[in-house]
Amino acid sequence: MAALSWQGIVAVTFTALAFVVMAADWVGPDITFTVLLAFLTAFDGQIVTVAKAAAGYGNTGLLTVVFLYWVAEGITQTGGLELIMNYVLGRSRSVHWALVRSMFPVMVLSAFLNNTPCVTFMIPILISWGRRCGVPIKKLLIPLSYAAVLGGTCTSIGTSTNLVIVGLQDARYAKSKQVDQAKFQIFDIAPYGVPYALWGFVFILLAQGFLLPGNSSRYAKDLLLAVRVLPSSSVVKKKLKDSGLLQQNGFDVTAIYRNGQLIKISDPSIVLDGGDILYVSGELDVVEFVGEEYGLALVNQEQELAAERPFGSGEEAVFSANGAAPYHKLVQAKLSKTSDLIGRTVREVSWQGRFGLIPVAIQRGNGREDGRLSDVVLAAGDVLLLDTTPFYDEDREDIKTNFDGKLHAVKDGAAKEFVIGVKVKKSAEVVGKTVSAAGLRGIPGLFVLSVDHADGTSVDSSDYLYKIQPDDTIWIAADVAAVGFLSKFPGLELVQQEQVDKTGTSILYRHLVQAAVSHKGPLVGKTVRDVRFRTLYNAAVVAVHRENARIPLKVQDIVLQGGDVLLISCHTNWADEHRHDKSFVLVQPVPDSSPPKRSRMIIGVLLATGMVLTQIIGGLKNKEYIHLWPCAVLTAALMLLTGCMNADQTRKAIMWDVYLTIAAAFGVSAALEGTGVAAKFANAIISIGKGAGGTGAALIAIYIATALLSELLTNNAAGAIMYPIAAIAGDALKITPKDTSVAIMLGASAGFVNPFSYQTNLMVYAAGNYSVREFAIVGAPFQVWLMIVAGFILVYRNQWHQVWIVSWICTAGIVLLPALYFLLPTRIQIKIDGFFERIAAVLNPKAALERRRSLRRQVSHTRTDDSGSSGSPLPAPKIVA
């Protein structure tokens, strides 16, 4: 075959450079592809004409993608899906059943709705549900993204990629004799996509024990931390072995400090008391979560030292919860080899004076025995977690000379925090449940302060056994994101809801705004009630944030100060109208803060269902009654008319970066096809097919090439670039156009290893605080597994009925596997556990080591119990100051 022309060389060279730019994340794919396309059209039409380059912007598949965002926004704004999913999820204590309950409904849902909004509204639901059920969040969020992707492969409208390929195929074969064979109906991909999704689901269920991460952090692990037992904690007066603390993974109690003595844990029968300081080895995220569940407060080194003093500020003052958070802003630092702190104990260092920092935890090891944080002798390479004070400056010379590199931010406890009250409705599901069981503990950015009864009495937040009653008012410290979560929580309404309703603003145009009070403005020194805020501004103050303080007053009684940040419920135009108001120095709308229009929930769901039914009926009768593009537009228009969403929300729902990426990628693929580059790559696939003696091998090659490209680019771009290559190869090998397109659809959705390869991956990556390594540990074997699955499906595509039957039977068996497992003899269970432990040791050695340590600790505690120990601790040495 002739060599590439200069046009082909230019096209492939600059396309490859664009791939490098996108893979390195230097510039986004929307800008990269748009600039690349403009460059390729600059050669007077010799590479690609302007008409062909612009054709993608009006492609019907792309237009369908764009306007389905409108429909998804309409459903999301009604809150209907959240209500349904909360009901479907129910309650589960095991990771296996939690995954079954969470993944399967999402797979079904994402088959008919765009997976991005599905994941958007499911993330806070799953976080709350996981905390409520005691299931690690990290076990749920990666499977959530994968479930949304897998479900999208079951119908032609399930993902934007599918719609893009459908649009490209319609355009390519519009005037061909194969037009009928090429026309996609909604379920034409189902014979391949459903088994593909089921086997992906099976893999996650089988691998969750040794591949999915638990509650872990991206930062230092195996830390020595201190927590204080609050007087009202559920563990007070309980033996350590009966408290539930020993059963918590990643939370290992090593010692107790009580009455001036450090007691090493040699006997789990020791009885815990209020005020005890427990020394724990584990990870910060896990310790914080367990602390919230059991009533334990994180202790820094200054509080640890204060607890030694019998008089002074007083224990309750030291551990009071009046501060805005248990810490201000945590940073991680590594002690340099040249540090003058080496050889000194933590207590001997003037941390605040020299660095503006307070030690919170130190990584264990360096040959030291576990003890108190203050008594740890510092060594080179020690990793510390430190809380920042107002005097902290990362550019201090002392910090640069004593620590390696830059101090890394770990957690921000100083994000704007508002004290907000929510009232419990009589019919709320949370009635009769503890705060934890109701799903209000462990939510990022949310902390329950107290509960007020209707009779005027109050319950402190540390009463972990209290069960919520109708008409209770729950006072919560929450950041802006958590306030949005509360506004959509079923059965709860804001205490200020009456004031909000009196503004007269329709719920359709209501949202939240943050406004900072001017130091010289007319609001300073007055209460919200005094200034008649609602009357003057036609808006209601929902909550107030004050730097470094929680204001224990109702909103209308707070005396405002300069710098206070008001959280205001108002009309969508309010921020623009008051941006230059002298009362405020900054006015900023809160994104996605519109309350759910629950009264329109049924209308929104019915309209979306009707849209899907038009496609299903058309597919069953092999007749297109209405194209999905105008159908989506009309559905969204009806949602607008019926008040499911407003016009601004409709406009903002469209993800223009996705539109630009896909449209420009169409033009680039046209350039690759027109210059012969696509044919060159297609010939390689044709050779594979002929060499392997069948079309199945060619389809597998198409799938693998698209999947690998999807890890580097966005899924839509990968599909658009691969389509002309695959279509040429398919036509040459006499493969039906639908089979070729299905291979691309499945491959383009297979971005599982890289968290940046797929939008839903990126969303759960941030929400779950995963590391790239954790994603790759799950995603790499998952990718290989699905390559094998896709190979079988594509090779045996003509026997899809048998593939379906086998897939469903195997899936049912795996779902019921835990029940079958416990019917096996113990010796067989031990062998099975050992087999999976060996696999885990190879794939994730650190996690396997931690599990073995945990098991040894539990066995050790059990043996101690059986020895008949009295429960009295051995005499412990006094702490040497």
UniProtKB/Swiss-Prot annotation:
Residues 854-881 are annotated as: Disordered. Keywords: Cell membrane, Membrane, Repeat, Stress response, Sulfate transport, Symport, Transmembrane, Transmembrane helix, Transport. Its main location: membrane. One of its GO terms (cellular component) is plasma membrane. One of its GO terms (biological process) is potassium ion transport. InterPro entries: Cit_transptr-like_dom, DASS-Related_Transporters, RCK_C, RCK_C_sf. Residues 212-296, 318-402, 407-492, 498-584 form the RCK C-terminal domain. This is Sodium/sulfate cotransporter 1. It comes from Chlamydomonas reinhardtii.
